[in-house]
Amino acid sequence: MADQNASDRCTVLVTSCDRYRDIEAPFLALWRRHWPDCPFELVAVRESGGDDGGTAADGFDRVVATGPGLSWSEMLAFALERISTPYVLMLMNDYLLDSRVDTARQLELLSRAEAADALNLRMNPNPPRAVKNSAYAVSCQAGYWNREFLLGLARRTKSAWEFERYGSYMFDESDPRPIMVTERKEFPFVDALHKGYWEPEGVALLKREGIGYDFSRRGLPPFWPRLKSNLKKAVFAVFPWELVVRVQNVFNLGMK
């Protein structure tokens, strides 16, 4: 399909919030540097509008301003209701591009999702399988989503945590449309923040790319949050993901 039709097929939706607006400048600087020929509209969702308090996009093609008081999922649904393309590439605003995006390859992957009528094509094989009603069948990792399906998930959950943990078990088994995952990581980004703190990889990326940032605004995590994160990684490394996630869901453990 011709590139000029790409903007009718898919929209990039960046989930943000006013508390994380300081991340948008490095996000956009790296986006324009590493994907200058992105064929899709770049839309951000957050509580407030542009710098003028209204519709200014602040470097995005469009900002959807929800107003205060909505949960993460409610903000996601609000934005999706204002997008018309059948597919959405959903990203978090701390997913910072670390190398050039291959536009032709992205269009191939979108075509693969369209040809299969896929509900989701996840571009990070972690976990390596895509199985409905299993751990991380739904993930905030970079991927192409059927917009209507994504909207349905957003309306049934509240937080990003619920979206992943509970949404993974909300599939209708009678729906033949697949969920898919690529064999290798196909979208080149660093997950730069964790629980509001910079990850070392994110700091290193900014320094390598010469992107300025005032780290007095937010820095690296203190000892205890870092220890908790490392312990969680160890649990997932030792025990089956399915077991861990089901226990978390039953007892509301690890909620973000």
What are these regions (language model features)?
Residues 127-135, 149:
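Short, flexible, basic/aromatic active-site loop/helix in glycosyltransferases
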Residues 86-96:
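Short beta-strand-to-loop acidic/aromatic patch adjacent to the donor-nucleotide binding site
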Residues 138-201:
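Catalytic core and acceptor-binding pocket of nucleotide-sugar-dependent glycosyltransferases
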Residues 179-229:
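PAPS-dependent sulfotransferase catalytic core
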Residues 1-68, 80-82, 86-87:
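N-terminal anchoring/stem segment of glycosyltransferases
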Residues 99-125:
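Conserved donor-nucleotide/metal-binding helix-loop-beta segment in metal-dependent transferases, i.e.
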